[in-house]
Amino acid sequence: MAKVVAIVGPTAVGKTALSLRVAQKFGGEVISGDSMQVYRGLDIGTAKATTEERSLVPHHLIDVKDIHDRFSVADFKVAAEREIDQITDRGHLPLVVGGTGFYLQALVENLALGRDQFDQESAAIRDHWHQIATERGKQFVWEQLNERDPAAAAKIPVANLRRVIRALEVIEKTGALFSTQPQPPAKNDFLIIGLTTQRPVLYQRINQRVDQMVANGLLEEAKWLYDQGGENEQAGKGIGYRELFPHFAGTVSRQEALEKIKLDSRHYAKRQLTWFRNQMTVHWFDLVSQQNTTEEIEALINGWLKK
């Protein structure tokens, strides 16, 4: 069982800087736990580590997919576990860094995602529930799960429609509760470090980060994605891109689109924090207002590695 450090939290709280410091101190390699950083060409809007930063420490699961490819949580789990094994074999410490909650939960808890999810019956069930979600909303679909399997619903946020539908799919296919489905034992030993800060400070930093992304060429990057048909691809669903597509289509102004990016980013950050606090065991730190806590984090990791 490999030891793995995960660094989680919303955007603009210092995950990249901390990951570089920890990797350099403990001989680590970074695995991106972000669902959008796999796409080549989407550098600014996904806040990838820079070329210079990646030259300091090996990074994995960045720039491995074309913008027209899909990349599911099951794909991530398989790829990340492969990287963990290879990094461990090299005698290095795997560091999973990112903010895509369910991707990290699937990896940390070794969730059984099911290899049957691509058969026709499963697809039909999912299509049915997706249609209902479109017509009646995510809350209604979650309530249907709550009626059938309250224990499962208690562990799955309303916003995680894919997971809610997956639970309903398993119930309908097997006739058994999703919450009673056997889960495989943990595959690796994770220490989860969470970064956060006071909400007004976080929101200010998010707004500043969006402004910096625009200065760095976000609109040009999003326009390239739009011209490639990215509006209809998984890659085009990311915050920072989807809000700009209506601007390129001429239906909203540039300023309106940028304000929407900031709003969506703030809302997403709030959801990320809620997810990690409700779904995972995390050691929380605020490096924005208390930078000396970096030493505390290093001491925590050092002690955990010696166990």
Swiss-Prot record:
Region: Interaction with substrate tRNA, residue numbers: 34-37
BP GO annotations: tRNA modification
GO molecular function terms noted in the UniProt entry: ATP binding; tRNA dimethylallyltransferase activity
NCBIfam families in alphabetical order: miaA
Function: Catalyzes the transfer of a dimethylallyl group onto the adenine at position 37 in tRNAs that read codons beginning with uridine, leading to the formation of N6-(dimethylallyl)adenosine (i(6)A).
Organism: Limosilactobacillus fermentum (strain NBRC 3956 / LMG 18251) (Lactobacillus fermentum)
Site, Interaction with substrate tRNA: residue positions: T100, R126
Listed SUPFAM superfamilies: P-loop containing nucleoside triphosphate hydrolases
Gene name of this polypeptide: miaA
Domain of life: Bacteria
Protein name: tRNA dimethylallyltransferase
